């Protein structure tokens, strides 16, 4: 087995390990394995997308977006990262709408307390 195949094998091994850990919700272990996979092959799109998804699942949205954007740059066509990025962008606009409603509600409470 030549050197390149060994590196790809190692990358796939760590990706599969990260996938198993993500399936049982061991998110910290999944991050470690997926990062190791990317150390062997930084162009492992599946590992990069899964790492982004794990970050997103942990509430680290910015880190997830970074991984998906890198993935999108490495493989511009037919990449599931497009879906993840668009979902985050859509949820960000929904979050902003909710945030504005909360601000208005709080302002109404201030007005009520001033007249009471």
Task: Give, region by region, the residue ranges found by the protein language model.
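TPR-adjacent "capping" and linker segments in tetratricopeptide-repeat scaffold/adaptor proteins
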Residues: 1-13
């Amino acid at each position: 087995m030549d050197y390149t195949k060994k590196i790809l094998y190692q990358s796939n091994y760590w990706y599969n390990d990260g996938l198993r850990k993500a399936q049982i919700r061991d998110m910290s272990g999944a991050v470690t394995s997926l990062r190791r996979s990317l150390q062997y092959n930084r162009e492992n799109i599946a590992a990069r997308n899964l790492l982004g998804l794990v970050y997103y699942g942990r509430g680290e949205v910015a880190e997830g977006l970074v991984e998906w954007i890198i993935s999108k740059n490495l493989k511009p066509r037919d990449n599931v990262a497009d879906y993840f990025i668009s979902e985050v962008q859509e949820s960000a606009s929904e979050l902003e709408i909710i945030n504005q409603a909360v601000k208005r509600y709080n302002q109404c409470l201030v007005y009520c307390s001033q007249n009471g």
